[in-house]
Amino acid sequence: MSARDPVGEGESPISGSPLREAIGRVGHALGLDAVGVADAVPTERTAFVREWWARGFGGEMGYLGRRLEERVDPRRVLPEARSMIVVGLACAPSYAPSQGLDAADSDERAPSRGRIARYAGGDDYHEVLLDRVRALEASLSHLAQRPVQARSYVDTGPILERAAAERAGLGWIGKNSCLIHPELGSHLMLGVILCDLVLPREAGVADHCGTCRACLDVCPTDAFPEPYVLDATRCLSYTTIELRGAIPEPLREAQGDHVFGCDLCQTVCPWNRSRPRTPLADPLGLR
């Protein structure tokens, strides 16, 4: 195995746990920080997702509702799917607080600077992660020594990435509705490979939010009607990115200097303290 050829030549056919371990090794060789496996069955969060959409919490993101049944059952996306390989890349540009780009680390921001979400300051994470996910997908047939039917997604298809990651043992979905990895925190970009390989499922990770309310209390627009439930129509990430019309007047004062997204509910999370990051390239010169 090498960086140029993470699979290696001449490896014998494998399946089950050895195949799962080989997939993990290839994923890490490609620069992925987390690799997990879940079975491709309807999510346990089906009822939650349907209720969330019915309550109008998805706002104008009609694409979520149009393919809702596919989102809750990966076999509707790829009928041959037996497993989901879920990967994560812990990446966030390390902005100096004085530059005004870090969501909540300092009150010493430059007065003329607006806040943008951490993930948006560098290269498009879709491209950065998708290249690695597709490389991992391309290795599957070689590892399994047979043609493998697979499809890869990085926030680009009808996949519930966080639910899949939770099922794959990458972490738990916290009170801020983000996936929290016990070692990497929640600034984790997720990718999913649906495939027809039968792989052992990972053990789940217990919810470690406990009695903490930091993410709920810091939200300037009260976007959490209850723990673990996000009303996207009140979230600054929605109103500054997804919403095509004017920002609702009741939310304008709370928006403050947020111009593209919001990280507050992640920045205050104890699980994000001193977590490793893979810096994205910075073509915009924001650092």
What role is predicted for each listed range?
Residues 200, 241-242:
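A short, flexible beta-alpha/helix-coil linker loop
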Residues 2-208, 247, 256:
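Auxiliary alpha/beta "docking" domains used to position bulky ligands
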Residues 211:
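SIR2/sirtuin NAD+-dependent deacylase catalytic core
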Residues 32, 214-238, 244, 258-283:
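Iron-sulfur cluster-binding cysteine motifs and their immediate structural context
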Residues 287:
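Glycine-rich phosphate/pyrophosphate-binding loop
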Residues 156-163, 232-240:
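Short alpha-helical interface patches
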